[in-house]
Amino acid sequence: MKIALDVMGGDNAPDINVDGAKRALQDFPLIEKIYLVGREETVRSSCDRWGLSGPRVEIVPAAEVVEMNESGLLAVRKKKNSSMSISVDLVKSGDADAVVSAGNTGAAVAAATVKLRLLDGVERAGIVTQLPNEFGVCNVTDTGANPDAKPRHLVGYAVMASILARSVYGKQMPKVGVMSNGSEDEKGTDFTKGTFCLLKHLEERGALPFKFVGNVEGHDLFEHEIDVALTDGFTGNVLLKTCEATAKAFSKWLKEELKANPFRMVGAACASGAFRAMKARLSADSVGGSPLLGVRGVTIIAHGSSTPVAIRNALRVSMEMVQQGVNPLIEEEMARLGTIPEVAEVYPK
């Protein structure tokens, strides 16, 4: 298995990527080779610093870098020799089985969608982000690929994310819900109601490869066994960033309160193990990155502030998706499902 890594992607590139690649190669013998894509001298210097060399790594020169503040689609069109574009090209040519990037999310989505194209039966690609909950993780989709979506697109997201939940996260019959402002069937906007109606219609036909649990609220993602939560890319991205900010704020406030009193500091020292465990549970490092489902090639988009551990785990997730054949399973299930109807075709007004 060969993976292309955009070494210039991320706030702390290239070192976090090179260090992460080294950790992945040490831990996962199934990875035959990692292509380190970026400015050659920069990548080579980083490899020297981290002691990364050998037949399982290959530096692929890329003269340009897509910056975090650039327009995604425009950057892909203008910077054809960027580390991100060339990383995706390696998947397109068949030289790599997957691509991992902690760079500009919009550019990563555009590059993968334009260059790799969509899988058969897929209308829109969607980003799936894992949020920790009492039962492992909740796969939230879409978290940023398509701000404007139609109900039938969310049905496609449901199929793809449920396959990910089953293949990579071990959920034999994933529980899928539509994010709404209440759990009652009639709650929500026309968009969420339409999604609910389509899924209910397909459930009654016995066409769903997962258990549809209806509408779910924000707290359900953390308190109940919801394996996949469906929403549009705008709402999903707001949810994701709110969760990230809340976790950071809670950590900051807790530290401030503990430091305000020496007796609290003594208690904190006694509970240091619990604090470390909680930090690990809330950290995105264990997840690694968010899969972009629906494109012809495994694509993982890591957070811009990823650590080496996160990059290592993003490479792991890409490896597991290739190993489990997630994309062929998506095409197979979408073919079985057939054309997804419009809401008006199922429930005419």
Swiss-Prot record:
- Quick one: which pathway? Lipid metabolism; phospholipid metabolism
Reactions catalysed, semicolon-separated, are: a fatty acyl-[ACP] + phosphate = an acyl phosphate + holo-[ACP]
Instruction: Mention any Pfam family matching this sequence.
Output: FA_synthesis
Location of this chain's protein in the cell: Cytoplasm
Q: What is its EC number?
A: 2.3.1.274
Q: Does the keyword Chaperone feature in the UniProt annotation?
A: no
| Identification of the protein by name | Phosphate acyltransferase
This protein's gene is called plsX
